[in-house]
Amino acid sequence: MRPAANQYEICFKCHANSNNKPQNANYSVYGRTPYRYTYAVLSDPYNIRLDLQSSVARHNVTQPSRGSVAPSLRLKMLDLSGNPTGRSLQGGGSYLYCTDCHNSDSARGSGGIGPNGPHGSSYFHLLERRYEYDAFPATPGSNTAAPAYTPGLLGTYAICDKCHDLDNSLLSQATTADVVFHKHYTHVVLQHTSCSTCHSAHGIQGGTSINNAHLVNFDKNIVGPDNKGRLYLDTTARACYLTCHGVLHNPKTY
């Protein structure tokens, strides 16, 4: 057997072209699986390899990071204690490992005392750190229980905060920050919307640069169409056409 040259190849044995992976969004034994906006036109929507090959938006696992830097990105990845590691995040050409997100919640490699690797975690989807989802509404677009935002190492979206400085950029309380970061503070902190409701973490297959830039791919379990049947984001016009948490966006600009 030819040995894997990259860590992700081991993960792809089950999570890429395998016919045995879950094929619907109701699969929730190990955490709720979002049903994304683009899935309706895809033949294999849960194929992580195809997500990460995206030319529209993806995390840099199988492809190197681009030269442009997300304004929320930290200089260095944080360990479980909140200390910077030696892993640089900014600049082109860097890679992430699957185990940067999917790992033991006490992994030694992240400063903990447990084993390294995705063997077990107290968090859904074998995540190393906390990541909350919105609860299912009665119908997509209607109001639903949502996780109140808490900051810090054990905060609501700690896995995002490992690389993105949430509280000093995206979720800063300052009015200017909510403008610069396009209402992330309003949505996440004030209105308790999960990151997952709007963003797909791996990458986006079948999307476009206008509708799916910045890993935007709405979870259709939570988000419904507007009163004209539209459900999409226009990044050129900075406008959302949808209904979410009982609020009609027809459109709402950001």
Segment roles from a protein language model:
Residues 1-254:
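A motif-centric signal for short, conserved binding hotspots located
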